[in-house]
A protein has these predicted regions:
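Feature captures the catalytic ectodomains and active-site-proximal regions of enzymes
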Residues: 1-137
Length: 137
């Protein structure tokens, strides 16, 4: 298994068609469920620095989506279970409008349909509504 630092630079230097999925599991396993606020903050800061280096290398046609499968507030100490925050859905690339606010209406079906429309894959059997036409530049 490659780390984030190993995997994403490879994606920027190799041509391929399709989708690459990277799971940043440490945010959840090492910091969120362990209620390690300082570790979570350090990991978020490291990820921010990584993005600052990664984003300028995105090519025409590249699309980056960042989201989460659930909340996991490291400062909530009553339980180590998932917490109930809204999760982010950040989309960027040269073909995406900047500064769009899609609100809180999104679900995984929306994300799946958006990916399918972007990749020109039939998604007629999936739930959700694509937001690709709203966000494309």
């Amino acid at each position: 298994t490659l780390s984030l630092h190993d995997a994403l630079p490879i994606l920027q230097t190799r041509d391929f068609e399709g989708i690459a999925f990277v799971n940043l599991v440490d945010f959840d396993m090492l910091y969120g469920h362990r209620r390690d606020v300082a570790g979570y903050a350090a990991a978020a800061t490291e990820f921010d620095r990584f993005l600052a280096d990664f984003l300028p290398g995105m090519r025409e046609g590249d699309l980056l989506m960042i989201t989460a499968d659930h909340g996991c507030d490291p400062s909530y100490t009553k339980t180590t279970d998932h917490t109930r925050e809204y999760v982010p859905y950040l989309v960027c690339g040269k073909g995406v409008k900047a500064g769009m606010d899609l609100g809180t209406k999104l679900c995984f079906g929306t994300i799946a349909k958006t990916i399918c429309e972007y990749l020109e894959v039939d998604a007629s059997t999936l739930d959700g509504k694509s937001v690709w036409q709203e966000i494309r530049a």
